[in-house]
Amino acid sequence: MSNEGSREESREPEAREGKSDEIFEVEKILAHKVTDNLLVLQVRWLGYGADEDTWEPEEDLQECASEVVAEYYKKLKVTDKTELIELLQKQIKKNKSQKSKKRSKTVSDHESNHDSDGSYGTPKTSKKSKKSAKNETPVSSKVPKVPTKAALKSYEATVSGPVAPNNAKKAAMEVRDTRRNWLDEESSDDEAETTAPLSDVEKIASKVKVVKAVEEKAEEPVKRPSTPPKPREVVIKKDPSESPVASASSVIPTSKRKSINAETSNGRQRTLAPPVIVKDETTWTVDGIARHTDVDNTKTKLILMTNSATGERKVVEGREAFELDGWALAKYLLDRCEF
C-alpha cells in the first residue's frame, strides 16, 4: 500500500496551498505516445491548467478513469490499447517511408543539379581550351615543322602496312610520295599564313599567263657567222653598141659594185645604200590579258600594262590600251599568233 501511495503521489500534480486534501480527477486525455514499450497518455486534471498536465500509464488510468480512456479511444476510432499501438506503428512506418522518399528526392535533385552544372561547365572549359589553343597558334606557327626520323619511320610503317615482296618497290614509292605531299602541305600552310593580301593590279597580274619563252626568243639578237660570206658575182647585160672595154668589165664583184653609181633605164643615177634599221622602242609593254566579269555579269577583257620608264602599272580595257601604246598591244598579239 505504501508503494501504491507513493505511485499516486508521483503521478498527481502538486497540490496548491490550502488544497492538500483535494481529490484529483481526470478531466480529459489530450494525447498519447509509447515510451519504453509502454503506452502513456497525456492527462488534463480537473481544475488545473495546461502547465499541470502529466503523462500517465494507460493501465493506471484504466483503474481510476476508464470512462475517460474509453471516450478517448472512441475519438481515435479504436477499441483498446492494442489497436492504438498498431495504429501508432503504422503511423511510424508511414512517417519513415515519407522521410526516406523525401531524402531520396532531395539526393536525386542534388545529383541532377550537379550533373547540369557539370554539363554546363564542360563547354566553358572547351571554349577556354579553344581560346588557349588559338592564342598558342601564332607561336607554334613561327617554329619550323621538322619531322623527326622516328616520326617518319612510324608514318612509313602506318602507311605501308604489310606489303608483298613483289610490291615492295611500289610501296616504297607510295611512302616517298606521301612524305613529299606531307612536307609540301606544311610548307604551303606556312606560306599561306605569311602572304599579305594582294591589290587589284596584283590579282589581275596573277591571272595573266605571260609566255616568257616567246618574248625572249623574239628579243634574242641574230647571230652572224664568224667568217663573212664570199661576194657573189653579178652579171650585167649591156647593149652591144657600147665600147668593148665596158663589156669586158661587165663582171664586177658585189663588194666593189656598192661604190659605183648604177644607171637606171631612164638615165638617172642612184647610189646603193644599206637599209636603215628602225629600232623597236615602246614606252609601254603588255604583261598579259585576262577575262573579267563585272557585277552585271558582263564579260570583258582587261589588259595589264607596265611603263618601262617609270615602272607604273595599269589595268585597262582594249581601247585605252591601244591609245596608250598601240604598237605594244599589236606586238603582244603578233608574238602569240600562229600562221
Curated annotation (Swiss-Prot):
Entries under Gene3D superfamilies matching the protein: 2.40.50.40
Locations listed in the record: Chromosome; Nucleus
SMART domains, alphabetized: CHROMO
Keyword DNA-binding: yes
Entry's Gene Ontology cellular component terms: nucleus; pericentric heterochromatin
Biased composition (Acidic residues): 184-193
UniProt feature, compositional bias: Basic residues: 91-105
Effect of a null allele: Expression of unc-4 in all 6 VC motor neurons in contrast to wild-type expression which is only detected in the vulval VC neurons, leading to hyperinhibition of HSN neuron activity and egg-laying defects. RNAi-mediated knockdown in an spr-5 mutant background suppresses progressive sterility and prevents accumulation of histone H3 'Lys-4' dimethylation.
Effect of substituting F24A: Disrupts binding to H3K9-methylated peptides
Compositionally biased spans, kind Basic and acidic residues: 106-117, 171-183, 230-241
GO MF annotations, alphabetized: chromatin binding; DNA binding; methylated histone binding
Residue ranges occupied by any Chromo domain in the UniProt entry: 24-84
Expressing tissues: Expressed in every cell of the embryo (at protein level). In adults, expressed predominantly in the head region and the germline.
Keywords: Chromosome, DNA-binding, Nucleus
CDD domains linked to this entry: CD_CSD
Any Gene Ontology biological process: heterochromatin formation
Bias-annotated ranges (Low complexity): 242-251
Disordered: annotated span: 1-21, 91-199, 215-272
Pfam families: Chromo (PF00385)
Described purpose of this protein according to its UniProt entry: Specifically recognizes and binds methylated 'Lys-9' of histone H3 (H3K9me), with highest preference for trimethylated 'Lys-9' (H3K9me3) followed by dimethylated 'Lys-9' (H3K9me2) followed by monomethylated 'Lys-9' (H3K9me1). Plays a role in maintaining correct unc-4 expression in the VC motor neurons where unc-4 is expressed in the vulval but not in the non-vulval VC neurons.
PANTHER family: CHROMOBOX PROTEIN
Protein name, UniProt field: Chromo domain-containing protein cec-3
Organism: Caenorhabditis elegans
Lineage of producing organism: Eukaryota, Metazoa, Ecdysozoa, Nematoda, Chromadorea
